[in-house]
């Protein structure tokens, strides 16, 4: 699979985020979030539409990330730059480790990451439901700088990082099997989703660490 499509997707994501960094419009952010979610669902169930849905998703997700990043940076100056650098560092390091054969996506590895990711998703879902009742899990709060809360974020960052290995494996497997063109866009979508998740989790972790000051 061609890496150019991944590059295009990330360029749209980052570029849109950059230009909407200081555009604080609740309507725009909510619209981008809902639109991005819908496009993500469509992409998952209609992979052949990926050449159209993925670039649009990147633009909407970039808009949402721009607003989120601005809010974090307003509270903790410089946190966004640090989060971006750390995300890139993790991406490059794991890519080198994967290409060098130090990390391999074995079946047991995949099963473990799938299970861990599913567990994290359940925790987030529980916290989401609790939010409707004016409550929430303490470890999820960015203002909670307790060892347990920080430890939870570290674990989530590690799991999010290891999901990149699954993306690398998917891209490599698709290239070896001569996957159709639209699957190149779908692979780019998967990698982009993981990177966005990793970036947001690093932001949360850095916010918790900064809240101790």
Question: What residue spans do the PLM features occupy?
Answer:
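A hydrophobic alpha-helical transmembrane-helix feature that marks the membrane cores
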Residues: 1-213
């Amino acid at each position: 699979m061609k890496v150019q499509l991944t590059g295009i997707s990330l360029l749209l994501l980052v570029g849109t985020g950059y230009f909407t960094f200081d555009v604080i419009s609740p309507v725009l952010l909510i619209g981008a979030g809902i639109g991005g979610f819908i496009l993500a669902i469509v992409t998952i169930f209609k992979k052949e539409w990926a050449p159209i849905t993925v670039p649009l998703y990147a633009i909407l997700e970039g808009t949402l990330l721009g607003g989120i990043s601005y809010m974090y940076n307003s509270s903790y100056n410089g946190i966004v730059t640090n989060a971006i650098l750390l995300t890139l560092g993790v991406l490059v390091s794991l890519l080198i480790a994967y290409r060098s054969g130090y990390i391999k996506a074995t079946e047991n590895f995949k099963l473990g990451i799938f299970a861990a990711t599913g567990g994290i998703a359940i925790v987030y879902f529980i916290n989401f439901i609790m939010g409707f009742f004016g409550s929430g899990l303490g470890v999820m709060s960015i203002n909670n700088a307790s060892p347990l809360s920080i430890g939870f974020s570290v674990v989530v960052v590690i799991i999010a990082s290891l999901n990149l290995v699954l993306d690398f494996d998917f891209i490599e497997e698709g290239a070896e099997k001569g996957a159709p063109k639209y699957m190149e866009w779908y692979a780019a979508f998967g990698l982009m989703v993981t990177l966005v998740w990793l970036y947001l989790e690093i932001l949360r972790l850095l916010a918790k660490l900064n809240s101790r000051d």
